[in-house]
Amino acid sequence: MRKNRAEKRDVLADPIYNSKLVTRAINKIMLDGKRGTAQTIIYDAFDIIKEKTGEEPIEIFNKAIENIKPHLELKVRRIGGANYQVPVEVSDERQVTLALRWLINYARLRNEKVMTVKLANEIIDASNNMGGSVKKREDTHKMAEANKAFAHYRW
């Protein structure tokens, strides 16, 4: 076990939108260390969003993340030979992490041909409270509500 917790590294704001959230999205979408490709995907998706909606893409992206953020999640706790799914509140940092993860995973699962279009459409859907990533948040909240009886097992 390590002696003390590793300190969080602060990400730099991206050069175009000056947003740390966009940098985190780029890092999340990046595969095999190909940052250039990841940046191209994000920025092209933002161009598509601007084209389709006529609004600022960064505002729509922030709104989408806000709509995806979960407030509760389930953690498995083993008590007396039984596993309980205990609902716990989610920290702000983890809310954003989960929102980005779900947004990108559900964008990858979409049926469009290119990742830029998939991502753009998922962001637009999420900003309108639709799409797979928002459904994932709703399902998580429903499960937490169903397991509310085990909330006293929190740690």
Curated annotation (Swiss-Prot):
InterPro entries: Ribosomal_uS7, Ribosomal_uS7_bac/org-type, Ribosomal_uS7_CS, Ribosomal_uS7_dom, Ribosomal_uS7_dom_sf. GO terms for biological process: translation. GO terms for cellular component: small ribosomal subunit. GO terms for molecular function: rRNA binding; structural constituent of ribosome; tRNA binding. The keyword Ribosomal protein applies. Keywords: Ribonucleoprotein, Ribosomal protein, RNA-binding, rRNA-binding, tRNA-binding. It comes from the Bacteria. The keyword Ribonucleoprotein applies. Pfam families: Ribosomal_S7 (PF00177). Transmembrane segments: none annotated. Part of the 30S ribosomal subunit. Contacts proteins S9 and S11. PANTHER family: RIBOSOMAL PROTEIN S7. Belongs to the universal ribosomal protein uS7 family. One of the primary rRNA binding proteins, it binds directly to 16S rRNA where it nucleates assembly of the head domain of the 30S subunit. Is located at the subunit interface close to the decoding center, probably blocks exit of the E-site tRNA. HAMAP family: Ribosomal_uS7_B. This is Small ribosomal subunit protein uS7.
